[in-house]
């Protein structure tokens, strides 16, 4: 129970100023630059707009309430330390370069020879997630209902079987901790895809 030891794989410092402020003509040399002007169709805004809107809510420190206008916006970061071999020598395009964030990648916690049943279960969970995303992009929320319900069942089944796969206590905890987050994501996707909304009302109507 409680928190377990962990170590960050990368440590970055911000390089330059956010949103391209102060007239910088280009990204700092040797820095990773992220495009903040990407439009998110689900959110209806760019990430720069979302960030500047949150920043405008400051009620102290003399912050400006101005919202960034549509257009080019970037943020740059410099990798200062990393536990990933030779990563500091790479020209990065993402903060996650060199880090396996896939569902299938969770098998690494099981050591050099993870159980076949674990590998198969993780692949199945990942396939349902990818299928749901593909159907959503093609058909919208109505098209993902079967995939997210099936995916929820698969991740719940895998979590229930972890203790029988011969994993060490630490390996089982690390994998289950992350699958619990994936289960929560599937649950929220099921609720959204089916348009479920619950409201709790008191007997007195208040």
Where are these regions (language model features)?
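Proline-enriched interdomain boundary motifs that mark the N-terminal boundary
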Residues: 196-200
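Metal-dependent de-N-acetylase/amidase catalytic core
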Residues: 1-195
